[in-house]
Regions:
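A short, conserved alpha-helix in the catalytic core of glycosyltransferases
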Residues: 220, 230-258, 287, 360, ...
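Glycine-rich, basic loop-to-helix element that forms the pyrophosphate-binding segment
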Residues: 126-143, 329-338
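A recurrent flexible, glycine/aromatic-enriched loop bordering the glycosyltransferase active site
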Residues: 133, 141, 190-216, 232, ...
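N-proximal low-complexity "stem/linker" segments adjacent to membrane-targeting elements
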Residues: 14-84, 302-331
Length: 471
């Protein structure tokens, strides 16, 4: 069914006039769905609002330099952005605005006026356009804070954004911190909240899930070299890949609070990736460079159905012997290993994997940090339920109420990412990793993934491989 829908969508998009007509017809229905989901989320948010730690309890209170490149920014958006920083409950910040040679003089004047009213605002005006990466790096060079925060010129921060981030730095000593976010429309109305997991390496290589709000150590940023202008349009994602390669997982922290409001308006990347086609090429190059830096062989392909996502196939240069066994709580890992000599073992309830599919999953199962690999699960409620290993239970409950038009739900149904303990109809595991488990471990997906996670392995969900009975 998903293939048929994909082909139908492709045919409609190929006919420009038909595509436009269908989009117009769907506007009222989409608005209805969005309003329904907004109401559900509003109720949930009122029930789950948390207060940040008290400032007085923070032993470390680092100065945070907020870098904002501007270019012909609509004045109302610019003022709202600055006001959201001024309203912060955390006092130790500076706001550095770097105007990237705006052609609209009203932008220059608005920045000067704001600087007169806000002592912590430092304006800089470039005489030549350097694009976002160049303007950001210029701002970083002027910063005096121990940490650098990235903020877009038309977005806004939650009043407690910096306090939550500072509290996380104080508690963990993290060098890189990111938060949850929500999109908002041109009128400032929030919609499409995005609930993120803690550090998730495979997720970051499928889609830039970190995006906003990102705060990083200035020393670390200096060491890795700032933003790279050759990746214009995806400079933040490329930077995040570089930063996280330089860190240990415990140095990366996630604040599970919606603290950033990403404004969607005409031609913004948040609204439509195809509005900036050069971004696509930059994303591909960033992911390929990341693979090279990690010294792994991969094939990077843009997802044909979901253009903001990427599929990364690992090539380890060998074919594996494989075998298939049924899940059985009365059978143990020790008994399984006595019955087969295969290098890769597929444990399943009923689904069949072709030889090609099994080899595809095996390349992931052979990776050092991956325990079990899970192909696509067609039961969407089960996919969302498995998120309880990486998201808060209340968020999982919320997602079960929402439709696929929820960005969070959609991304977790369609992207590759790491999980913990899960319940799945099919998993693929390397023999060497099964051999490291207690021999009396029962053959169930939950028991196997729990034991593997206990050994430090991650589970990998790969929805791009569909068992044959589910096609």
């Amino acid at each position: 069914m998903s293939y048929i829908l994909h082909r139908l969508t492709h045919l409609i998009k190929a006919n420009r006039h038909l595509h436009r007509a269908v989009r117009c017809l769907l506007v009222p229905y989409r608005a209805h769905l969005d309003n329904r989901q907004r109401r559900i989320y509003d109720v949930w948010q009122r029930q789950h609002t948390e207060q940040p730690p008290a400032l007085s309890l923070l032993a470390q209170q680092p100065r945070i330099s907020i870098i904002v490149p501007t270019y012909n920014t609509p004045i109302p958006f610019l003022r709202e952005m600055v006001q959201s920083v001024v309203a912060q409950s955390y006092p130790h910040w500076e706001l550095i605005l770097v105007d990237d040679a705006s052609t609209n003089e009203t932008t220059h004047q608005a920045i000067r006026d704001l600087a007169e009213d806000v002592p912590q605002l430092k304006p800089f005006f470039l005489d030549k356009n350097r694009h976002i990466a160049g303007a950001t790096n210029y701002g970083i060079a002027q910063a005096t804070g121990e940490y650098i925060a990235l903020l877009d010129h038309d977005d806004i921060l939650h009043p407690d954004a910096l306090l939550w981030v500072a509290a996380m730095i104080d508690r963990t000593g993290a060098q890189f911190v990111y938060t949850d976010e929500t999109k908002m429309d041109e009128h400032g109305r929030p919609y499409q909240p995005f609930f993120k997991p803690d550090w998730n390496a495979d997720f970051l290589r499928a889609v830039n899930y970190i995006t906003h709000f990102a705060v990083m150590s200035r020393q670390l940023l200096t060491e890795v070299g700032g933003e790279d202008g050759s990746y214009n349009g995806t400079q933040d994602w490329e930077l995040f890949l570089r930063l996280t390669r330089a860190l240990q997982p415990e140095q990366i922290a996630h604040v599970p609070q919606i603290l950033y409001y990403w404004r969607v308006h005409q031609a913004s990347t948040a609204k439509d990736l195809d509005a900036k086609p050069y971004v696509i090429d930059a994303q591909r190059r960033a992911l390929e460079a990341d693979s090279t830096a990690r010294q792994v062989q991969t094939q990077v392909e843009r997802d044909p159905q979901y253009g903001a996502q990427w599929q990364m196939s690992y090539s380890l240069g060998q074919a594996y012997s494989t075998d298939t066994a049924s899940f059985d709580e009365s059978t143990t890992v020790g008994q399984l290993l006595e019955a087969t000599t295969a290098e890769m073992i597929c444990l399943t309830q009923h689904n069949a994997l072709s030889a090609a599919m099994l080899q595809h999953l095996a390349t992931d199962a052979a990776r050092p940090m991956i325990g079990a690999v899970v192909p696509r699960i067609t039961d969407e409620r089960q996919v969302i339920a498995n998120l309880s290993s990486i998201l808060q239970p209340s968020v999982v409950g919320l997602l079960q109420q929402l439709s696929r038009r929820s960005f969070t739900k959609h991304i977790y149904l369609t992207a590759r990412y790491n999980l913990g303990i899960i319940d799945a109809p099919t998993v693929v595991v390397a023999r060497t990793k099964l051999a490291a488990l207690a021999p009396d471990t029962p053959l169930t997906s939950a028991q196997i993934t729990a034991a593997l996670c206990g050994k430090g392995y991650n589970t990998l969900y790969n929805p791009h491989v569909t068992p044959e009975e589910d096609v």
